[in-house]
Amino acid sequence: MQQQEQQQGGMKVKVQRFGSYLSGMIMPNIGAFIAWGIITALFIPAGWFPNEQLNTLVSPMITYLLPLLIAYTGGKMIYDHRGGVVGATAAIGVIVGSDIPMFLGAMIMGPLGGYLIKQTDKLFKDKVKQGFEMLINNFTAGIVGAALTILAFYAIGPVVLTLNKLLAAGVEVIVHANLLPVASVFVEPAKVLFLNNAINHGILSPIGIEQASQTGKSILFLVEANPGPGLGILLAYMFFGKGSSKSTAPGAAIIHFFGGIHEIYFPYILMKPALILAAIAGGASGLLTFTIFNAGLVAAASPGSIIALMAMTPRGGYFGVLAGVLVAAAVSFIVSAVILKSSKASEEDLAAATEKMQSMKGKKSQAAAALEAEQAKAEEASELSPESVNKIIFACDAGMGSSAMGASILRNKVKKAELDISVTNTAINNLPSDADIVITHKDLTDRAKAKLPNATHISVDNFLNSPKYDELIEKLKK
């Protein structure tokens, strides 16, 4: 039984890591995607301010700029700047060799280029004569990049192009058959498993951008980014919740709906797993509404805020987008209200959701208890003091949303305690080696430990409302 739990936990971490890697190629470049979306929404013939000259920016940006940024980032994740350069060079082969924006090809060639130049450098390590290092470094990168570019142009490009067209055709069939709402059955539970960024930016966005380049918008940008389901759940807690969940729900609703940080409502579902049904019902009804009104966005809305959604909505499409968000929120609220009111069990506090969170994510409560005991011992054994702690890092999947909120809260507490300690946030994949304390959500701690085993790791159930912040401050003040 214990071995099975460990295997399940290991599989969960692997899935999260793979998903994080996919989204990691897109997330750092979201600003460029939004820039393209703004230019598209404003200056194409059907835009707000049609401009024939500025419209010429749209095609080169989506054909060359965005795929090359993705490829560079993918290569850099494997082998820093050198890997990024070779990855971007290799990607030009699939880009030039196709007649559609080659995002999928860039997501393949970028990491492949980074990996191959990394292996090539290992092959020549300690074998280069003194004084020839720069020559060998430059030419190995050039030769590997050129070879991969030619291979991508003639062999990999056509395969990826066929795969791209099959995926696009499959999505078209699903949309026209009005089956897209069924996607919520998979998307909403996956979001609570911290795969939201992987789904949105790793899978849906690349296909959505290709659709948007042809039709001016894509409904795929609304599949994961819709804040309606989460808003409905948080509103239900405002009216029918108990204890700290009721008191914290209003603030969480504001941050979720206007700030676009969806992770903030995950603990509320994990306290009462039946609420996943509310999220699915809200998501499905929202997608059905989007489909009926032929709604879509011109580019990815990141974060999933109502403000970002409105900014990426094409001219004349506001009613459909708003209707989908409001319907999703209303349905989610009604289902959540029924579940919360009919629940006989007493409402759990936010900090008491540990065991149910583990059961939702593939681990038994015994494993959770063992993990907590192990963490408690580790924290007690390590003598934390201002002298031994210089940097505290909050880490989450993307390093932009929930971890940023947690870092802000602890930073204020550190300032009030007059401690000279840096508190920042980052993605788990980018954890710096000099971090003394790493704070993560409980379900991401295993990944953080694997990335930075020598740091002190603290797990929390909710970045916004954890008693461990005050406990940490007290330990640091001693």
From Swiss-Prot:
Residue ranges constituting the PTS EIIC type-2 domain according to the UniProt record: 18-347
Domain of life from the UniProt record: Bacteria
Localization terms from the record: Cell membrane
GO molecular-function terms, A-Z: kinase activity; protein-N(PI)-phosphohistidine-mannitol phosphotransferase system transmembrane transporter activity
GO biological process, one term: phosphoenolpyruvate-dependent sugar phosphotransferase system
PTM sites of type Phosphocysteine: C396
Cytoplasmic side: 1-29, 77-139, 192-278, 341-478
Record topological domains on the Extracellular side: 52-55, 162-170, 299-318
Protein's name in the database: PTS system mannitol-specific EIICB component
